[in-house]
């Protein structure tokens, strides 16, 4: 089988490529150039797409004895990931750019080019397991990345390979060292690759500008402070609110609601954050077909954490793919519009199975009667 190995310059993708070679596949390595602007992406050990990372990927390919190329996807990345990220925050949402990159860049733009060039699959260094079209959590629970892959369709999964999902991270590093890969001890990348400073608020402010609004007490309606734009806030945020002192009950204040139409950011105590029901749109089902009737499942709303028992049901909401109505058996906090909600079928033996996902469009704070 002809396999295109996406090589970020890190240890995970290098070992994924090595395993594809060891499995007897005809492997070609490729690094995605996602920006041409100096300093636009993180560099060194904290990045995944910098010139230094491209060099590390090339050296790993040389060790493996496979052809290697750098492909320019900068324009597509800006349009589908960066611009989408900015627009979502301007609308008071909280997007995850890693999901969008997987959905639009790695497993659409890259995969489409791979197929056009005669490749059968794209291999990446994601920590997840995929067998017969079924996507499951990785063996290494701490490194599991099935959440950021939950946006992939059945067709996209049919062209994907995740060679390292059955192995703990430390063993991957040991294997890299045994294979003579210089990236064996390279630190993991963190944060958002296209925000070099790590200051998301400043990054967004430079692109959205000042859109004044008010910070309002969620219970009393009292205006507590002014702000420069809703893009500086996310649900559950505690720091940087521009408000002195605790909430009326003496406890810390959190962002509990964002209203982009009026520029209002509501803050209150933690009790205002509980969510018992979630509405999601643009549903994606990994099997290619929506389930019939209610489904008992676990839902996850963040890459790390935000997990709860639930009952989910596909609904016709007029959006592409339809919607998902989710009733929680226990409350979640910090649930924001724009986040992805990923549904899992628990399986302690084989690993939790990803059923599908949707983009959160609304929440309800009243307990349900399941």
UniProtKB/Swiss-Prot annotation:
It catalyses: S-sulfanyl-L-cysteinyl-[protein] + uridine(34) in tRNA + AH2 + ATP = 2-thiouridine(34) in tRNA + L-cysteinyl-[protein] + A + AMP + diphosphate + H(+). The record marks 126, 339 as: Interaction with tRNA. Residues 143-145 are annotated as: Interaction with tRNA. It is an enzyme of class 2 (transferase). Disulfide bonds join 101-193. It is found in: Cytoplasm. The keyword Amino-acid biosynthesis does not apply. Its main location: cytoplasm. The active site is at residues 101, 193. GO terms for cellular component: cytoplasm. Its EC number is 2.8.1.13. One of its GO terms (biological process) is tRNA wobble position uridine thiolation. The keyword Cytoplasm applies. GO terms for molecular function: ATP binding; tRNA binding; tRNA-uridine 2-sulfurtransferase activity. ATP binds at residues 6-13, 32, 125. Coiled coil: none annotated. Keywords: ATP-binding, Cytoplasm, Disulfide bond, Nucleotide-binding, RNA-binding, Transferase, tRNA processing, tRNA-binding. Belongs to the MnmA/TRMU family. NCBIfam families: PRK00143.1, trmU. Catalyzes the 2-thiolation of uridine at the wobble position (U34) of tRNA, leading to the formation of s(2)U34. This is tRNA-specific 2-thiouridylase MnmA.
């Amino acid at each position: 089988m002809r396999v295109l190995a996406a090589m970020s310059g890190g240890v995970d993708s290098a070992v994924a490529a090595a395993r594809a070679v060891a499995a007897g596949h005809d492997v070609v390595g490729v690094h995605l150039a996602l920006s041409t602007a100096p300093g636009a992406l993180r560099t060194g050990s904290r990045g995944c797409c910098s010139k230094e990372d491209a060099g590390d990927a090339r050296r790993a390919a040389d060790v493996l004895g496979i052809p290697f190329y750098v492909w320019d996807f900068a324009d597509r990345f800006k349009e589908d990931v960066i611009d989408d990220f900015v627009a979502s925050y301007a609308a008071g949402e909280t997007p995850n750019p890693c999901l969008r990159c997987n959905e639009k860049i790695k497993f659409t733009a890259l995969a489409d080019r791979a197929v056009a060039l005669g490749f059968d699959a794209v291999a990446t260094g994601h920590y997840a397991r995929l067998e017969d079209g079924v996507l499951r959590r990785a063996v290494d629970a701490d490194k599991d990345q099935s959440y950021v892959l939950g946006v992939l369709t059945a067709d996209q999964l049919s062209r994907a390979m995740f060679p390292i999902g059955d192995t703990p991270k430390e063993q991957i590093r040991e294997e890299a060292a045994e294979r003579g890969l210089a990236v064996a001890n390279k630190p993991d990348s963190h944060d958002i690759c296209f925000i070099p400073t790590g200051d998301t608020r400043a990054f967004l402010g430079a692109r959205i500008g000042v859109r004044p609004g008010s910070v309002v007490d969620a219970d009393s309606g009292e205006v507590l402070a002014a702000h420069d734009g809703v893009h500086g806030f996310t649900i559950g945020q505690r720091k940087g609110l521009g408000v002195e002192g605790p909430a009326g009950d003496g406890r810390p204040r959190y962002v509990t609601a964002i209203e982009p139409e009026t520029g209002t950011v509501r803050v209150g105590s933690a009790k205002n954050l509980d969510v018992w029901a979630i509405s999601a749109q643009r549903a994606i089902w990994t099997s290619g077909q929506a389930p019939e009737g209610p489904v008992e499942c676990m839902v996850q709303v963040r890459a790390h954490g935000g997990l709860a028992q639930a009952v989910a049901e596909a609904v016709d909401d007029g959006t592409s793919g339809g919607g998902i109505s989710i009733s929680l058996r226990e409350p979640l906090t910090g649930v924001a519009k724009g986040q992805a909600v990923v549904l899992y079928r628990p399986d302690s033996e084989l690993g939790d199975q990803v059923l599908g996902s949707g983009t959160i469009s609304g929440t309800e704070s009243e307990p349900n009667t399941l």
